Every structure is written in C-alpha cells, then in structure tokens.
C-alpha cells in the first residue's frame, strides 16, 4: 500500500490556461530533484513573474512550487528506500543536505523516520531462504 502511493502526485493537477507552463515547471522539477531550485529560476523558465507563478501553480496543483517540489523529492526518497538504497544515498539523490534534513521532512510527511520505514519493510517483506 505504501509503495502504491509513494509515486502518486501529492495533489491533483488541474490544467488551465497556464497548463503548458505548469507542466514545464513540474517536468523541470522532476528532472532536477537533487538540485536546489529557486522560485526565480522557475519564473524565468515560464516567463511569468514570481508572484504570478505562485498563484497559477497553487491554483493548478493545490500547493506552492516549493512544497510541491519537496513532496516530489520525498516520494523519490521513499521509493529509493523501498528499493534498498541507504538513507544517506536517498538524501543525496533527492537534494537533501544530509540524513537529518531528509529525516525531518520524511517524518513530517509520513509520521515515521526513514529508518522506521525501512525497519517496517524488513518486517513485512517475505523472507527468501538461502
């Protein structure tokens, strides 16, 4: 169940008149999960002002760009942990400064630390005899 929802978008995207620009922002975020993306960078990408981008992005996705980006990063980190990556590798690959930074955000989103998530996977995964 956790895996099924790990890659689901955090909120439904409702295309509107700015849909190509919002899609471009989301695609850019997905391609740069390990980077520190600024609102100015996204505004330049779309040709919109920072404030207009904030308004249309939030109207389309339900979240401001930074929160949406953090959700994307956390879903990727969760997938990596599920696939067997270490917490340090997941943190580095998803742009978190260190394991502690990932831990705070991960726990805030799912209510458990990455270590507890991994431990739960170990308890629920079928054991393969050697």
Question: Across the structure, where does each feature detected by a protein language model lie?
Answer:
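Terminal helix-turn-helix DNA-binding modules in bacterial transcription factors
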Residues: 27, 31, 35-40, 48, ...
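Short hydrophobic/aromatic patch on the recognition helix
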Residues: 53, 57, 101-102, 106
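Nucleic acid-binding interface residues in structured DNA/RNA-binding domains
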Residues: 113
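An amphipathic alpha-helical interaction segment
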Residues: 1-30, 40-41, 52
């Amino acid at each position: 169940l956790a895996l099924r929802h790990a890659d689901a978008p955090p909120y439904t995207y409702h295309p509107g008149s700015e849909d190509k620009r919002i899609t471009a922002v989301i695609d850019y975020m997905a391609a740069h999960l390990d980077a520190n993306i600024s609102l100015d960078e996204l505004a330049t990408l779309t040709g919109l002002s920072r404030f207009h981008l904030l308004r249309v992005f939030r109207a389309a996705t339900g979240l401001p760009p930074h929160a949406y980006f953090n959700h994307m990063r956390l879903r990727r980190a969760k997938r990596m942990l599920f696939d067997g990556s270490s917490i340090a590798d997941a943190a580095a690959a998803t742009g978190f400064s260190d394991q502690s930074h990932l831990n705070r955000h991960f726990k805030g989103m799912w209510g458990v630390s990455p270590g507890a998530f991994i431990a739960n996977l170990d308890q629920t995964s079928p054991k393969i005899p050697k």
